[in-house]
Amino acid sequence: MSPADAFTSGSRTITPPSRPAPSDQPAWNTQKNSSMPTFRYRPFAEEVEPITLPDRTWPDKIIDRTPQWCAVDLRDGNQALIDPMSPARKRRMFDLLVRMGYKQIEVGFPSASQTDFDFVREIIEDGAIPDDVTIQVLTQCRPELIERTFVACEGARSVIVHFYNSTSILQRKVVFRADRDVIKKIATDGARKVLEEAAKFPDTDWRYEYSPESYTGTELSYAKEVCDAVTAVIDPTPEKPLILNLPATVEMATPNVYADSIEWMSRNLDRRDSIVLSLHPHNDRGTGVAAAELGYQAGADRIEGCLFGNGERTGNVCLVTLGLNLFTRGVDPQIDFSNIDEIRRTVEYCNQLPVAERHPYGGDLVYTAFSGSHQDAINKGLDAMKVTADEQGSDIGDITWQVPYLPIDPKDVGRTYEAVIRVNSQSGKGGVAYIMKSDHGLNLPRRLQIEFSQAVQRITDGEGGEVSPKEMWDVFAEEYLTPIRPLERIKQSVQAAEVDGGTDTITATVKVDGVEQEISGSGNGPLASFVDALSTIGYDVSVLDYSEHALSAGDDAQAAAYVEASVTSPTGVATTVWGVGIATSITTASLRAVVSAVNRALK
């Protein structure tokens, strides 16, 4: 390979591996050893004492019931964000978790952050915590931090105080420079302190959780020793158990190793009948879900995680994936995932991070078949479902789901069949999205691609053959750009707020069914102001998603704006559609996109 053919990044160059392969490598395997510095790393069994469990039972277990969930989005998830949640975003996330059915929610680290402290006070004083929901707060074992944690929670009905300290070989050596006895004493002193502080607030039902942080890097015998010492101090009972949380703070080995450690701990911990054994897997090796499922099979009772796997580095285990994995095997997750798009939109708003298009169950592409053979199998599977339902005198939604390539009925999580089998039926000829971008400069959002593909499909179904780029543009313009009934925007004037975060006002001239009138409104930006103005003439519009981009460079460049909106008709029926606007002004383009959505919803 010549230097010009190499991929470079900084001082590194990607070159084909060429070092000799192991002598026992089969002849049919032509791979060679690379020049990467493998010598700098070592097997897990050389870093932490190996686990011996020849009579393990977890491989034969079947998951047939749901664990106790604890959502840690507001603490572990929030601390990993580039832009940590504002109070409003935290409240929106908390309310979502409550609506979905989570009964244990870690709401912050109040002793480490004034923002977290204030949020805990807010949800307590506002009465936002339902009686059957227990909040959880995290604290290190330092006395002053524990004291402030309890002050933050004063007045709450039920609270889990989650205290922790790191116990791993590496952290004992390089962070604390302390021996095992010192580290254990930190844990037991913390346990005594939480009991002492709890006595000052007798009106709250206090529960306790202890984590030997970096558990996966800790000798099992020592992890048990520390956990048993904490248990002895807390003195739990079967009626009021202690939560012992065994986190894969850093995922260090294959999931079966984690499962072995959980089964060993479950067998050997003191007073197991008074212990709730909890898991907290991270995803450093990409196997967080597998580790959680195998660890649960191995004897755990409870799992902590985040929606869509947000969290430090590669994230916490994904509660959506875990819950819907149970659902697809006939186990009720005891959580409502029936509107996966609303859940995703809320999580994306709160985290200010996108959910990957291939993320299990929630990504834009997970119910999409691009392959013709896959589409054919899905079509035949759906047809077979209809036949079976008719034979049984039932609806498809009432019979066992069996469709190739789709482990779940998209409708059960609020998706549609059209998005599955229609989205890219012409992709062999270039694809709707590719043509719209390469020929017309429009970078359509994924869900708009799905919606517009259906319009293209109607043309191909009716006329047959291939749709040319010009024909595709004509369909797009007719669908999104040219309709002016019932609503047409003529002009607008925007008065921007004088300070950041202020309120903009808009005055616009519009035609409603051809009759010109002037409207005005206010909001956080021109788009929100225009939506507010439309409400004064009977148009109920809620913007769900918005994006924009320039179509070219230069001072006179046009911009494209895309709005996904819920538009409620005069009869009270809400329709979710996309609207598109193109103009030299991005403000005008965005308002045209709203008008486009209204006209499409009400046509």
What feature does the model see in each segment?
Residues 55-60, 66, 78-84, 89-94, ...:
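Non-catalytic terminal/interface segments that mediate subunit docking, oligomerization
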Residues 17-75, 330-520, 555-558:
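A mid-to-C-terminal "edge-of-domain" accessory segment
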Residues 39-41, 69, 85-103, 120, ...:
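Alpha/beta enzyme core
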